[in-house]
């Protein structure tokens, strides 16, 4: 089982008080660092990320189980920077949960929104549910990928809550550290940390319950993988969590594009 022991309060306070808030961006050997972190705890991976990037590291929060990532990062750096995507189609419970997390940790969450100049023509021409007919790619491209691309254009490193057990078809090879193949450019590499990659759903929920973290109330109604309201449904017993997303499409295509590298690497 992956170690994710709780950091004692005295150590958490010390880490928070001594965290250097200035950007560090220290050069490093990517393969060597990735290899050294491969078997480390999520906290150790995040600590290394902060050591190399300081406040240039952004945490991605989806409004679901990745509250664990926010919690771990906040305990290492109280000045942690967090962003979340508001597609305009999230569940009411998710909006409430994002507010809960903001208040619980006393942090600002940078909420990213779609560009209305792109969104309005799509809705006007195809309506609000074109993804059931045309696939989710176009809608996700406007509501998720474009806002994220705008955000990451000014970011040197980010951390996600991706886990290998979330999708055997697309996430089974998620590395703890990689160059983001979807959003890097030749001039500007983007470093992507996945500290929770080796954690299982059971371990994530053990952490949430042990520390009594806030969580999305949709989880109490059978939702596991939570996205936009029209594209998410509860899963049945013995179904994989990803079967609750875009259920009308092939399993191998169940990535919205935020982690397109998972698909690119399999091409």
Swiss-Prot record:
Deletion phenotype: Cysteine auxotrophy.
Pfam families: PAPS_reduct
Reactions listed under catalytic activity: [thioredoxin]-disulfide + sulfite + AMP + 2 H(+) = adenosine 5'-phosphosulfate + [thioredoxin]-dithiol
Subcellular locations according to the entry: Cytoplasm
Positions bound to adenosine 5'-phosphosulfate: 60, 85, 144, 161, 242-245
Binding site for [4Fe-4S] cluster: 139-140, 228, 231
Record SUPFAM superfamilies: Adenine nucleotide alpha hydrolases-like
UniProt effect for mutating residue 139 to S: Loss of activity. Contains essentially no iron
GO cellular component terms given for this protein: cytoplasm
Keyword Nucleotide-binding: no
Pathway noted in the entry: Sulfur metabolism; hydrogen sulfide biosynthesis; sulfite from sulfate
Cofactor note: Binds 1 [4Fe-4S] cluster per subunit. The cluster is required for activity and may play a role in binding and activating the substrate for thiol-mediated reduction.
Biased composition (Polar residues): 11-25
The enzyme's E.C. designation: 1.8.4.10
Key word Metal-binding present: yes
Domain notes: The two chemically discrete steps of the overall reaction take place at distinct sites on the enzyme, mediated via conformational flexibility of the C-terminal 18 residues.
The protein's role, per its UniProt record: Catalyzes the formation of sulfite from adenosine 5'-phosphosulfate (APS) using thioredoxin as an electron donor.
NCBIfam families xref list: APS_reductase, cysH, PRK02090.1
Assembly and binders: Homotetramer.
Family: Belongs to the PAPS reductase family. CysH subfamily.
UniProt-listed PANTHER family: 5'-ADENYLYLSULFATE REDUCTASE 1, CHLOROPLASTIC (PTHR46482:SF9), 5'-ADENYLYLSULFATE REDUCTASE 3, CHLOROPLASTIC (PTHR46482)
Protein name: Adenosine 5'-phosphosulfate reductase
Native organism: Pseudomonas aeruginosa (strain ATCC 15692 / DSM 22644 / CIP 104116 / JCM 14847 / LMG 12228 / 1C / PRS 101 / PAO1)
Gene symbol of the encoding locus: cysH
């Amino acid at each position: 089982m992956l170690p994710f022991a709780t950091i004692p309060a005295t150590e958490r306070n010390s880490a928070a008080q001594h965290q250097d808030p200035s950007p560090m961006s220290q050069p490093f050997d990517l393969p060597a660092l990735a290899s050294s972190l491969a078997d480390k705890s999520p906290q150790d991976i995040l600590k290394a990320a902060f050591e190399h990037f300081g406040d240039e590291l952004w945490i991605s929060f989806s409004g679901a189980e990745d509250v664990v990532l926010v919690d771990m990062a906040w305990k290492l750096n109280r000045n942690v920077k967090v962003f979340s995507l508001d597609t305009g189609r999230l569940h009411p419970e998710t909006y409430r949960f994002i507010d809960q997390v903001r208040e619980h940790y006393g942090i600002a969450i940078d909420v990213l929104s779609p560009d209305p100049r792109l969104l309005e023509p799509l809705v006007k021409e195809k309506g609000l549910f074109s993804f059931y007919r045309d696939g989710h790619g176009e809608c996700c491209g406007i509501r998720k990928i474009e806002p994220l691309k705008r955000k990451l254009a000014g970011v040197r490193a980010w951390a996600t809550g991706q886990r290998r057990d979330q999708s055997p078809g697309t996430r089974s090879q998620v590395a703890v550290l990689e160059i983001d193949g979807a959003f890097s450019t030749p001039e500007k590499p983007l470093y992507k940390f996945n500290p929770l990659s080796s954690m299982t759903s059971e371990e994530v929920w053990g952490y949430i319950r042990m520390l009594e973290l806030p969580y999305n109330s949709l989880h109490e109604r059978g939702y596991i993988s939570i996205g936009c309201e029209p594209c998410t449904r509860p899963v049945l017993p013995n179904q994989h969590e990803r079967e609750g997303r875009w259920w009308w499409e092939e399993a191998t295509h169940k990535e919205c594009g935020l982690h397109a590298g998972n698909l690119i690497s399999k091409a």
